[in-house]
């Protein structure tokens, strides 16, 4: 009857299966590609204590992600935002540029489609895959290389690769990779942004 849908959603929101399933998905997406039972339990407990309060659930996810030492693969879109922010680059159209033509500023739709992760493209009902193996083809990696190059050339990055590495405490394998990439800053920038560490992969 009237109000039945609200009762159903309230029931499902605090159901144990819901808590367990969504906590595991959140842990896999934000904490680790293979989250531990303790990671999932931490989020589950926050869910129960807060009776499904999303602020508390999200806080628990962030806390666990900060504490985690496990590599977390970055989705193409997440990686792109990370690259732009680390370099303090200007790559997308902002509010003031929406109706202006500037061939150095990319349209969001074109960018996401090229990355293979567009809001507007048909996709599976359960969203994009959280399995990193789905995103690790040579083609998908080559796209990241091209985007890193485009951000360097057109995005006017304000932070050098060496400063970025110092800020994030880059490991020795990443520093060695960047050093071997070449003598020019654009080569170092691409190597850093497409390194295993910044893509959220274990270093070989």
Language model features with spans:
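Flexible, low-complexity segments enriched for small/polar residues
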Residues: 15, 19, 23-50, 55-204
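Short, functional "switch" segments adjacent to catalytic/cofactor/reactive centers
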Residues: 1-15
């Amino acid at each position: 009857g009237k109000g039945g849908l609200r009762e159903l959603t309230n029931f499902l929101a605090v159901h144990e299966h819901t808590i367990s399933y969504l906590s595991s998905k959140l842990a896999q997406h934000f904490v680790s590609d293979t989250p531990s039972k303790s990671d999932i339990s931490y989020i589950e407990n926050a869910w129960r204590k807060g009776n499904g309060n999303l602020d508390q659930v999200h806080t628990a996810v962030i806390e666990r992600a900060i504490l985690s030492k496990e590599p977390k693969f970055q989705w193409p879109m997440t990686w792109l935002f990370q690259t732009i922010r680390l370099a303090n680059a200007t790559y997308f159209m902002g509010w003031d540029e929406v109706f202006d033509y500037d061939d150095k500023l990319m349209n969001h739709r074109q960018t996401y489609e090229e990355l293979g992760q567009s809001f507007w493209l048909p996709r599976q009902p359960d969203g994009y895959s959280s399995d990193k193996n789905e995103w690790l083809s040579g083609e998908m990696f080559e796209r990241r290389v091209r985007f890193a190059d485009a951000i360097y050339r057109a995005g006017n990055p304000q932070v050098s690769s060496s400063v970025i590495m110092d800020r994030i405490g880059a490991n020795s394998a990443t520093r060695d990779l960047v050093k071997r990439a070449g003598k020019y800053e654009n080569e170092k920038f691409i190597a850093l942004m497409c390194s295993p560490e910044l893509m959220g992969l274990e270093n070989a």
